[in-house]
UniProtKB/Swiss-Prot annotation:
Annotated protein name in UniProt: CASP-like protein 2A1
Similarity field: Belongs to the Casparian strip membrane proteins (CASP) family.
Extracellular side: 60-80, 131-163
Regions that span the bilayer: 39-59, 81-101, 110-130, 164-184
Subcellular location: Cell membrane
Subunit-structure text: Homodimer and heterodimers.
Primary location: membrane
InterPro entries: CASP/CASPL, CASP_dom
Keywords: Cell membrane, Membrane, Transmembrane, Transmembrane helix
Entry superkingdom: Eukaryota
GO cellular component entries: plasma membrane
Membrane topology term: Multi-pass membrane protein
Pfam families according to UniProt: CASP_dom (PF04535)
Length: 209
């Protein structure tokens, strides 16, 4: 190998097998993560208050009148909403503390945060969607199965449930943003796919006239 070729090899940036970035790129990513850490910590703490508020409103949602008594515990979708908000509140607190403490950026930690963000995002989204469907039936009924609307009789119950569901969807928005942040942090640690080294052109057969 010539001297010039050796210099080119030494000057080329080292990459990790599997398409990961070099150590210098990882250090740059760590510096960028340190700059956005306070913002991400606040964003992770925000769902804590939202989830607790949605859970507390739904837990107190019970109405009694001359037509009877209705409580959130009578409906499986609303019970799921309470459980999901409780779990997401605990995760928000834990993840906010985890992000607030400076740690070396590693690929395994990025994968863990990414996967947990995905799990809890879909968990709270499913709870909000199921509860929204219950609210729709409570307000409009379902003529095909002869279900009458119930909010005309239990209006206070429906209003509290609607408030809890609206707050839950605000938490969903926060978790979607967190999922985008964690996915960007994870996949930016990998190099983009390299173009194929095969033939770039397409040969077209020429037929004689």
């Amino acid at each position: 190998m010539s001297k010039m070729a050796e210099e080119k090899v030494l000057a080329a940036p080292a990459t990790v097998d599997g398409g990961m970035q070099s150590s210098g790129d990882l250090q740059a990513s760590s510096a960028a993560a340190a700059r956005v850490r306070p913002v991400e910590t606040l964003l992770r703490a925000a769902p804590l208050g939202l989830c607790v508020a949605a859970m507390a409103i739904m837990l107190r949602n019970s109405v009694t009148n001359e037509y009877g008594t209705v409580s959130y515990s009578d409906l499986g979708g609303f019970k799921y909403l309470v459980y999901a908000n409780g779990l997401c509140a605990a995760y928000s607190l834990a993840s906010a503390f985890y992000i607030a403490v400076p740690r070396p950026a590693t690929l395994s930690r990025s994968w863990v945060v990414f996967l947990l963000d995905q799990v809890f995002t879909y968990l709270i989204l499913a709870a909000g969607a199921a509860s929204a469907e219950l609210l729709y039936l409570a307000y409009n009924g379902d003529k095909e199965v002869t279900w009458s609307e119930a909010c005309g009789v239990f209006g206070g119950f429906c209003r509290q449930a609607r408030t809890s569901v609206a707050i839950t969807f605000a938490s969903v928005a926060c978790y979607i943003l967190l999922s985008l942040i964690s996915s960007y942090r994870l996949f930016s640690a990998y190099d983009p796919p390299q173009p194929s080294l095969g033939n770039k052109g397409v040969e077209i057969a020429a037929f004689p006239r």
